[in-house]
Amino acid sequence: MESNQTWITEVILLGFQVDPALELFLFGFFLLFYSLTLMGNGIILGLIYLDSRLHTPMYVFLSHLAIVDMSYASSTVPKMLANLVMHKKVISFAPCILQTFLYLAFAITECLILVMMCYDRYVAICHPLQYTLIMNWRVCTVLASTCWIFSFLLALVHITLILRLPFCGPQKINHFFCQIMSVFKLACADTRLNQVVLFAGSAFILVGPLCLVLVSYLHILVAILRIQSGEGRRKAFSTCSSHLCVVGLFFGSAIVMYMAPKSSHSQERRKILSLFYSLFNPILNPLIYSLRNAEVKGALKRVLWKQRSM
C-alpha cells in the first residue's frame, strides 16, 4: 500500500438525503414501526412463555423467529433513527463492522428458522401420526441451535474476509446502515473474492432453502386436499398460507437485493429493499403469522383474563 494512504476510523452514513422536515417525519414514522415491531414480537414471546398450550414445536420456532426479528431490527434501526435527527451522521469503523456482522447473522438465522418452521408444518400435515416422534423437544432444540450457530459462523466468514481488506476510503456510505455491499466500496483493494463468496453464500442460504420450501409446500398442498374435514382443511390452509406469505416476502426481497444484477436497480431502490426486510418485515411476521392465529388469540385472552382476576 502506498505511504500516503490512511486508514479510515469513522464512516459517514448518507442515509436518505431528504429535506430536514421530511427527515423528522421519517423519524416519527420509523420510530412507530420499530416500537410496534418490539411490542408485537414481545407479546408473542410473552404469550408463548406464559401459556403452556403454546409449548409446541411450532411455537418454539415462532419464539425464535420473534427474537430474531427484534434483534434484526435493533441492529440497524436505532442508528438510523439517530442519524435522522443528528447533523453529523457518522459511525466509527469498528461499530460499523459489528453492525454488518450482526445484520448478516440475524438475516441468515431468519432464513433458516423459516425453513425449520416449514419443515415442522410439513411433518405435522404430511406425517401427523409420527409428528410427536419426529418433532420432539430434543430435535427442536438441535435444529434451532444449529440455525443460530451456523448463521453466526457464516457471518463471521464474511467479516473475516472483509477485515483482510485495506480500508483507506472513500469515507462515505450511501446507505442508512453499514450494509455489506456498501462496506466493500470503502476498501482500496480488489473485492471480487468477497463478492463471489457473498453471492455463493446468498445462493446457498436463499435459493436452496427456498426451493426446499416450495417442494415441501407442494407436498403439503396435496396432503391438505386429501383432508376430509372442511374445518381441518381450512385450518391447515390458514396456517400454511400465512407461513408461505412470510417466506415469500422475506426471501423474495433478499434475493432481489443480493443476487439480482447491479444494473437492475439503483442505490435508492436498494435502500428501500433493505428498509423493507429490516423494518417492515419484522412487524409483518407477528401480524401475518401469529396475531391472526386462533391459538395465539386464545392465549392472549387467557392471559388478560388471568391478570384481570388477580
UniProtKB/Swiss-Prot annotation:
What residue ranges are annotated as transmembrane?
25-48, 57-78, 100-119, 139-157, 195-218, 236-258, 272-291
InterPro entries hit by this protein: GPCR_Rhodpsn (IPR000276), GPCR_Rhodpsn_7TM (IPR017452), Olfact_rcpt (IPR000725)
Task: Name its cellular compartments.
Answer: Cell membrane
Question: Mind listing the GO molecular function terms for this protein?
Answer: G protein-coupled receptor activity; olfactory receptor activity
Q: Name one Pfam family in it.
A: 7tm_4
**Record-annotated disulphide pairs:** C96-C188
Biological processes per GO annotation? detection of chemical stimulus involved in sensory perception of smell
Q: Per the record's keyword annotation, is Nucleotide-binding included, yes or no?
A: no
Question: Superkingdom of this entry's organism?
Answer: Eukaryota
For this chain, the family text in UniProt reads: Belongs to the G-protein coupled receptor 1 family.
Q: Which residues are glycosylated?
A: N4
Side of membrane Extracellular, spans: 1-24, 79-99, 158-194, 259-271
Q: What does this protein do?
A: Odorant receptor.
Keywords per UniProt: Cell membrane, Disulfide bond, G-protein coupled receptor, Glycoprotein, Membrane, Olfaction, Receptor, Sensory transduction, Transducer, Transmembrane, Transmembrane helix
Q: Name one GO cellular component term.
A: plasma membrane
Topological domains, Cytoplasmic: 49-56, 120-138, 219-235, 292-310
Membrane topology field: Multi-pass membrane protein
Q: What is the protein name stated in its UniProt record?
A: Olfactory receptor 2A12
